[in-house]
Amino acid sequence: MAVMAPRTLVLLLSGALALTQTWAGSHSMRYFSTSVSRPGRGEPRFIAVGYVDDTQFVRFDSDAASQRMEPRAPWIEQEGPEYWDRNTRNVKAHSQTDRVDLGTLRGYYNQSEDGSHTIQRMYGCDVGSDGRFLRGYQQDAYDGKDYIALNEDLRSWTAADMAAEITKRKWEAAHFAEQLRAYLEGTCVEWLRRHLENGKETLQRTDAPKTHMTHHAVSDHEAILRCWALSFYPAEITLTWQRDGEDQTQDTELVETRPAGDGTFQKWAAVVVPSGQEQRYTCHVQHEGLPEPLTLRWEPSSQPTIPIVGIIAGLVLFGAVIAGAVVAAVRWRRKSSDRKGGSYSQAASSDSAQGSDVSLTACKV
């Protein structure tokens, strides 16, 4: 996404965060795509990435030399040539639909041909711990703003403005929701089960967070206590601060969970405290990989060093993933009681299961 400005990347990231929350004990397969027009520089750039839970497993970039859907996880490499051929054809078809849509939307909004514009899309499905369908979704955005979304009933649409109402009427006339629902409840679920089974050593593992606390004096009267959680998987984690047993939610500075670049995640939460009162504050960490929640308290004798190099490296990788893959920050929710020891059967031997997990459905705006 090198053609995109930093502000656009922030919009993409914030949108992705709003879209990537799942239910406790559930698993998800999601595809994210972005098309960016570049007047005077050829065809729009199209990037698509697929995620199972917190793990990116496929990627396509129209600017890449291969012009192919490429694996991004070891367990997906076992799929045969037909899988890669059909997924490549499907994403290329989506890119051509987006190319037409960029021109159509520019007309809807009475925009000139000079500026660069973006179409974003997220679609996918969730299954419960038993592998059964929970929900499906598709959401589209234009220039970083909501455009149209499939409703929870998978039968109707919500349009964000008058331009999107035009698209809504077109899609209703074409019965697009019905086609999409068939994919979300069928092919998407079959492939998600298949991926969870083939990649279970990675996708169904739990890595407990490595935790510590740091102290930084900001004045003679105040200090910052920062609670760190590093090297954990899956991404869902809760860090909370308490003072004398009372939650300090309003006074807590909390960053989003960030990928560390090695398949694990990192997060911190900080509070400003009066100097000399550090012992009144405790950090509480909850994660699926912990047998019970952890409670941390500042110990002056330990004086740990803030792991600046590791965190900065993680942030750099985080930015690179956003720029290259559109969406890398995630907030999936799964709990140990529903997940540990789970097993998912292979998808049925049907045409969809043998061919492609990318949606075949695409409808012009």
UniProtKB/Swiss-Prot annotation:
Segments on the Cytoplasmic side according to the record's topology features: 333-365
Single Gene Ontology BP annotation: immune response
GO MF annotation, one: signaling receptor binding
Cystine crosslinks: C125-C188, C227-C283
Positions in the Extracellular compartment: 25-308
Chain residue ranges for the region called Disordered: 338-365
Biased composition (Low complexity): 342-359
SUPFAM superfamilies recorded: Immunoglobulin, MHC antigen-recognition domain
Phosphoserine modification, residue list: S343, S345, S349, S350, S352, S356, S359
Residues covered by the Ig-like C1-type domain: 209-297
Region (Alpha-3): 207-298
PROSITE patterns associated with the record: IG_LIKE, IG_MHC
Region feature (Alpha-1): 25-114
Highest taxon in the source lineage: Eukaryota
Signal peptide residue numbers: 1-24
Subcellular location: Membrane
Parts of the chain that traverse the membrane: 309-332
Bilayer topology term: Single-pass type I membrane protein
Annotated region (Connecting peptide), positions in chain: 299-308
Pfam families registered for this protein in UniProt: C1-set (PF07654), MHC_I (PF00129), MHC_I_C (PF06623)
Glycosylation sites recorded in the entry for this protein: N110
Record text on subunit structure and interactions: Heterodimer of an alpha chain and a beta chain (beta-2-microglobulin).
Cited function: Involved in the presentation of foreign antigens to the immune system.
Family: Belongs to the MHC class I family.
Name of the molecule in the record: Class I histocompatibility antigen, Gogo-A*0101 alpha chain
